[in-house]
């Protein structure tokens, strides 16, 4: 226990595989769950003062944590999950579940968030990655965000400053961490919103291997192509390394079918990139982030 951080939920040498969608990942030296911005500031100030590395893990849905784990503090925002409405503006803390946030918009007959109704993860991660699906993306509704800088300061970033691109935002370079974000929604027809969300969720269930642990879509969409189709054309559907395989249901996904490891994921990703480039001339770029230390 760290005396200076008494009262904050901090777990030492905690295996991260229990917190990731892939169900892989080694231990964090310190895994912290702040309940509010004050506790978050205490953790970051302590880490910076003592030259201890720190990072925010989010909901770890489009992420692979290596088997050696992560040194220093890993901060999870599970308890920072408030969602508020002010007219047609929705404000959500970074730890708010993205799918549950879309349900809040639906309940209040607000349209604009339907595209995200089946995307796993957190609000903070969705902004970081400019998450999107079925023609929609976070950039289309984003207004602004409060972020925590690497130095521990809080500042506001506008939509223009966020410089969104395909699965990209400026904070991927700056290291700023989203604390909360505001989104501009519009009044809509409740039944129409429900129908659209039901349609998109049905498509996901038909096409995606939701019954297995995975990191979601592994590769970015290459211009003029679909990653899943290129992987199928390379005869890699069902290809397996250790306990991880290319999904037979959707080749753009890699699933943990038999107690796989992060090493299995990395080797399979590398094999797919190499083989697809050999067969099609297209070099796939991972969408999934890989962090931490190897064993």
UniProtKB/Swiss-Prot annotation:
InterPro entries in the record: FAD-bd_PCMH, FAD-bd_PCMH-like_sf, FAD-bd_PCMH_sub1, FAD-bd_PCMH_sub2, MurB, MurB_C, MurB_C_sf, Oxid_FAD_bind_N
Similarity annotation: Belongs to the MurB family.
Alphabetic keyword roster: Cell cycle, Cell division, Cell shape, Cell wall biogenesis/degradation, Cytoplasm, FAD, Flavoprotein, NADP, Oxidoreductase, Peptidoglycan synthesis
Known cofactor(s): FAD
Involved pathway(s): Cell wall biogenesis; peptidoglycan biosynthesis
UniProt protein name: UDP-N-acetylenolpyruvoylglucosamine reductase
Function, in words: Cell wall formation.
PANTHER family: UDP-N-ACETYLENOLPYRUVOYLGLUCOSAMINE REDUCTASE
Catalytic residues (UniProt): 167, 217 (proton donor), 287
GO cellular component, one term: cytosol
Cellular compartment(s): Cytoplasm
Enzyme class of the recorded protein, top EC level: oxidoreductase
Pfam families (UniProt xref): FAD_binding_4 (PF01565), MurB_C (PF02873)
GO molecular function: FAD binding; UDP-N-acetylmuramate dehydrogenase activity
Gene3D superfamilies: 3.30.465.10, UDP-N-acetylenolpyruvoylglucosamine reductase, C-terminal domain, Uridine Diphospho-n-acetylenolpyruvylglucosamine Reductase, domain 2
GO BP: any one term: regulation of cell shape
The enzyme's E.C. designation: 1.3.1.98
FAD-binding PCMH-type domain segment(s): 23-188
Reactions that this protein is recorded to catalyse: UDP-N-acetyl-alpha-D-muramate + NADP(+) = UDP-N-acetyl-3-O-(1-carboxyvinyl)-alpha-D-glucosamine + NADPH + H(+)
